[in-house]
C-alpha cells in the first residue's frame, strides 16, 4: 500500500525536512514507539497502531523525516456524527518538539477533512495536558471557530490514576476555498 502524500508536504523544522502523508501499516511500530516515548499518551498495543494505519489512514497523518516517522495525528469520523472527526492521539518525537509540527499536522488534517464535508473536530484532553489545550485552543482561534469544553469521562469511567477527559469540540470548520479558474 503506497502512502498518499498530502498537499504541500514539505516543511523544514529546525533545519530538517519533514514530509506529511497518510500512514501505512508499516508505520505502526514507529507510531507505537513515538506514543510510548511521549510519556503523556495512553499507549495502545503495537497491533492497534498497525491496524489504525490500515483502517483509518484517510483520517490520520504521519510526519516523516529522512529517518522515518517523527510525528502523527490519528483520528476517525464518528459513526453516529458523520460531520465530526475525532482526534484520537497527537504525538511528536522528542527531537522535533517545539517547532509547530503537531499543529501543522492538525492543520493539514483539518483542511483535508474539512474539504470532505466534516464541519467539527473533537478531541479529549486531560486537565493537566497544557500542550494539547494550547494547541486545540490556538487551532480554534486561528480557524475562526468556536471551542466548547465539556466533561466527557470522569474518574468513575477510568482506571484509578487517570485524569478525567474533557471533550473539546471545535467548529464549524471553515469550508476550504477552491482555487479560482
Residue ranges, per PLM feature:
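A short, internal acetyl-CoA/4′-phosphopantetheine-binding micro-motif in the GNAT/acyltransferase core
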Residues: 89-97, 125-126
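Conserved active-site alpha-helix within GNAT-family acetyltransferase domains
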Residues: 103, 127-149
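Acetyl-CoA-dependent GNAT
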Residues: 25-26, 33-88, 93, 173
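Conserved GNAT acetyl-CoA-binding A-motif
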Residues: 113-127
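Short amphipathic alpha-helix that is part of the acyltransferase structural core
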Residues: 4-44
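Conserved acetyl-CoA-binding loop-helix of GNAT-fold acetyltransferases
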Residues: 92, 98-111, 134
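C-terminal "cap" of GNAT-fold acetyltransferases
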Residues: 143-181
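Short histidine/acidic/glycine/proline-rich micro-motifs that form metal-
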Residues: 124-129, 154-156
Amino acid at each position: 500500500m503506497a502512502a498518499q502524500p498530502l498537499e504541500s508536504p514539505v516543511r523544514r523544522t529546525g533545519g530538517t525536512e519533514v514530509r506529511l502523508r497518510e500512514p501505512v501499516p508499516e508505520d505502526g511500530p514507529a507510531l507505537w514507539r513515538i506514543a510510548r516515548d511521549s510519556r503523556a499518551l495512553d499507549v495502545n498495543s503495537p497491533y492497534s497502531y498497525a491496524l489504525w494505519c490500515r483502517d483509518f489512514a484517510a483520517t490520520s497523518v504521519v510526519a516523516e523525516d529522512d529517518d522515518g516517522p517523527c510525528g502523527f495525528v490519528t483520528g476517525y469520523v464518528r459513526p453516529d456524527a458523520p460531520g465530526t472527526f475525532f482526534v484520537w492521539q497527537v504525538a511528536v518525537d522528542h527531537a522535533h518538539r517545539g517547532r509547530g509540527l503537531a499543529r501543522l499536522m492538525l492543520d493539514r488534517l483539518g483542511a483535508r477533512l474539512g474539504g470532505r464535508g466534516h464541519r467539527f473536530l473533537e478531541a479529549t484532553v486531560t486537565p493537566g495536558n497544557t500542550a494539547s489545550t494550547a494547541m486545540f485552543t490556538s487551532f480554534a482561534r486561528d480557524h475562526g471557530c468556536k471551542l466548547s469544553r465539556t466533561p466527557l469521562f470522569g474518574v468513575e469511567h477510568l482506571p484509578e490514576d487517570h485524569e478525567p477527559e474533557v471533550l473539546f469540540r471545535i467548529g464549524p470548520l471553515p469550508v476550504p476555498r477552491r482555487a479560482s479558474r
